[in-house]
């Protein structure tokens, strides 16, 4: 287990987060993930309204982050693990990005060196039987990001 795995375990404890990831802010390298990823899904093709689009999730995510949460490739949009997300709010001051997808969403907190990502799916239950929800995901993601910022990350 890498030193970063404990942070992802914090995110996913009690099944409050569907997927937890920590990525390098500059290159998108996955530092830790609860799904064993070493990279986001890159270099695949999707069909959008009859048009083929090549997807590089890492590049698209970082480009949107640097564009205040607005995708720079509108055909691909923002995708995490081949699921399309839409920006609900990007708060540049607090460095938090809230996203929505069918039956769920994500919270991305940005630190000096990393992106802390937690996704949720309202059709999945936490350990306490309550559906995964944005409030809980936002709380754990933002809390972990604050801890990493204090540690210089």
Curated annotation (Swiss-Prot):
Keywords recorded for this protein, A-Z: Actin-binding, Cytoplasm, Cytoskeleton
UniProt entry tagged with the keyword Cytoplasm: yes
Predominant location: cytoplasm
Subcellular location: Cytoplasm, Cytoskeleton
Xref: SMART domains: PROF
Gene Ontology molecular function terms on file: actin monomer binding
SUPFAM superfamilies: Profilin (actin-binding protein)
Gene Ontology cellular-component annotations: cell cortex; cytoskeleton
InterPro entries, per database record: PFN (IPR048278), PFN_euk (IPR005455), PFN_sf (IPR036140), Profilin_CS (IPR027310)
Subunit and interaction comment: Occurs in many kinds of cells as a complex with monomeric actin in a 1:1 ratio.
Function: Binds to actin and affects the structure of the cytoskeleton. At high concentrations, profilin prevents the polymerization of actin, whereas it enhances it at low concentrations. By binding to PIP2, it inhibits the formation of IP3 and DG.
The family this protein is said to belong to: Belongs to the profilin family.
Name by which UniProt lists this protein: Profilin
Source organism of the structure: Tetrahymena pyriformis
Upper taxonomic lineage: Eukaryota, Sar, Alveolata, Ciliophora, Intramacronucleata
């Amino acid at each position: 287990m890498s030193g970063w795995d404990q942070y992802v375990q914090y995110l996913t404890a009690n099944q409050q987060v569907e997927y937890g990831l920590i990525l390098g802010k500059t290159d998108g390298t996955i530092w830790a993930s609860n799904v064993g990823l070493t990279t986001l899904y890159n270099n695949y093709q999707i069909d959008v309204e009859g048009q083929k689009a090549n997807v590089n999730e890492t590049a698209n995510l970082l480009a949107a982050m640097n564009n205040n949460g607005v995708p720079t490739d509108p055909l691909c949009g923002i995708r995490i693990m081949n699921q399309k997300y839409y920006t609900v709010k990007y708060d540049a001051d607090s460095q938090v990005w809230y996203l929505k997808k069918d039956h769920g969403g994500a919270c991305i907190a940005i630190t000096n060196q990393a992106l802390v990502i937690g996704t949720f799916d309202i059709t999945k239950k936490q350990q306490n039987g309550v559906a995964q929800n944005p409030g809980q995901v936002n709380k754990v993601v933002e809390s972990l990001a604050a801890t990493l910022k204090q540690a210089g990350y």
